[in-house]
Curated annotation (Swiss-Prot):
SUPFAM superfamilies: YcgL-like. This is YcgL domain-containing protein Pcryo_0807. PROSITE patterns: YCGL. Residues 1-95 form the YcgL domain. It comes from Psychrobacter cryohalolentis (strain ATCC BAA-1226 / DSM 17306 / VKM B-2378 / K5). Pfam families: YcgL (PF05166). Gene3D superfamilies: YcgL domain. Disulfide bonds: none annotated.
């Protein structure tokens, strides 16, 4: 299974894998590969940036996610969302809370 990986400027350390089951025979026309994402979800992501193309058949392991889980999601829904590790998410939430609190009391 081939896939393209995208990241989003509004969401640090979040990556979305988009299935490309017909690669390389699907490159004749320009296509909105992110069109497989639910519209509401996609709207909240902001601007995307292509990271890389990956052939999962020749990739033994992935750094932060289980390869079999990625393959299953790509096959069933056409995409996989890789969220940041919990410690990163917690740190980001704490920072946002602190910034919000500072803006309330420093005005």
């Amino acid at each position: 299974m081939h896939c393209d990986i995208y990241k989003f400027l509004k969401h640090d350390d979040m990556y979305i894998y988009i299935a490309r089951p017909d690669y390389p025979n699907d490159t004749d026309e320009i296509k909105d590969w992110l069109g497989v994402l639910p519209k509401d979800f996609r709207a909240g992501l902001g601007r995307s940036k292509f990271v890389m193309h990956l052939d999962l058949a020749t990739t033994p392991t992935l750094a932060r996610v289980d390869k079999e889980e990625v393959l299953a999601k790509l096959a069933s829904q056409g995409y996989f969302v890789q969220l940041p590790p919990q410690d990163v998410m917690r740190r980001q939430a704490e920072l946002r809370a602190r910034e919000s609190q500072d803006s309330i009391y420093n005005t």
